[in-house]
């Protein structure tokens, strides 16, 4: 099982190298062909893909990129192609040189499968690996190629981001400044209002303490327990008040105590 995984990894790496044009040939109509072939035929040079598409009114979106090499973005059965300058000066499609890889998959697959079975049957001793130059089957190539195509399309789309321009940057900076000013105004307004309220509370407490200090003696005099009560004074004199004597009211005894005196 381990040998099968090792063989699969080696074959996948070889397939990726071939798909990116490291050997100059291509598989499956060259949809993933990436070799630097700038001329479809002697005497002709490929035009830049972006310039050629901008010069055509009904040019499809190829997504080949900003270069002038042979590619096959529309999966043309004839293989990679490019735009060349026609007789009238208009860009026209021209197939590139057919550089298909030799079809050795039918021979390589049984050989590699047999070698894998033989390696699995060896009970011990030296391990036998499949040759590194064995090419994979077309089913394996088809399973790996779509992932590469998606990554290529994502890479092209990331490069085609539009620049906002000077006006966009100015508007963005202006909005940021406005937001910062509004936030600073809110903070300053809250701080000022809070300080004003605290100052008013402090002044009110000072006034209350001053009023208490002024009104304290008056309250002491109005206290019922401290009121002064006026008392009546009785004066006793030493001399007796004279009494008028009337007739018949004289006493029978004098002061000396002698009757009839």
From Swiss-Prot:
GO terms for molecular function: endopeptidase activity; phosphatidylinositol 3-kinase inhibitor activity; signaling receptor binding. It comes from the Eukaryota. It is found in: Cell membrane. The keyword Lipid metabolism does not apply. Residues 90-122 are annotated as: Disordered. The chain crosses the membrane at residues 167-187. Keywords: Cell membrane, Disulfide bond, Kringle, Membrane, Signal, Transmembrane, Transmembrane helix. GO terms for biological process: negative regulation of phosphatidylinositol 3-kinase/protein kinase B signal transduction. Residues 90-101 have a biased composition (Basic and acidic residues). This is Phosphoinositide-3-kinase-interacting protein 1. It comes from Bos taurus (Bovine).
